């Protein structure tokens, strides 16, 4: 399973809200020897794969052309809408 991601430059609550209104959501990739990286993911491409068991195993994120093997660590969902607010990924 592979997802395209972009490094996030604007941080904070306002920037996160703008992303969510644009049908995207913020995420972070951490772990290993590298520094944590804030990224942006497309909501529809992720939410359509979340019901599959393979999503919760090792997946590939393509962050600005570089492939990174990660595993979902934490998923923050909207209380009553079928939306993802934020995700944490841990490098494998």
UniProtKB/Swiss-Prot annotation:
GO terms for biological process: translation. Keywords: Ribonucleoprotein, Ribosomal protein, RNA-binding, rRNA-binding. InterPro entries: Rbsml_bL25/Gln-tRNA_synth_N, Ribosomal_bL25/Gln-tRNA_synth, Ribosomal_bL25_short, Ribosomal_L25_dom, Ribosomal_uL5_bac-type. One of its GO terms (molecular function) is 5S rRNA binding. The keyword Electron transport does not apply. Pfam families: Ribosomal_L25p. Gene3D superfamilies: Ribosomal Protein L25, Chain P. CDD domains: Ribosomal_L25_TL5_CTC. Part of the 50S ribosomal subunit; part of the 5S rRNA/L5/L18/L25 subcomplex. Contacts the 5S rRNA. Binds to the 5S rRNA independently of L5 and L18. This is one of the proteins that binds to the 5S RNA in the ribosome where it forms part of the central protuberance. This is Large ribosomal subunit protein bL25. It comes from Photobacterium damsela subsp. piscicida. The lineage of its organism: Bacteria, Pseudomonadati, Pseudomonadota, Gammaproteobacteria, Vibrionales.
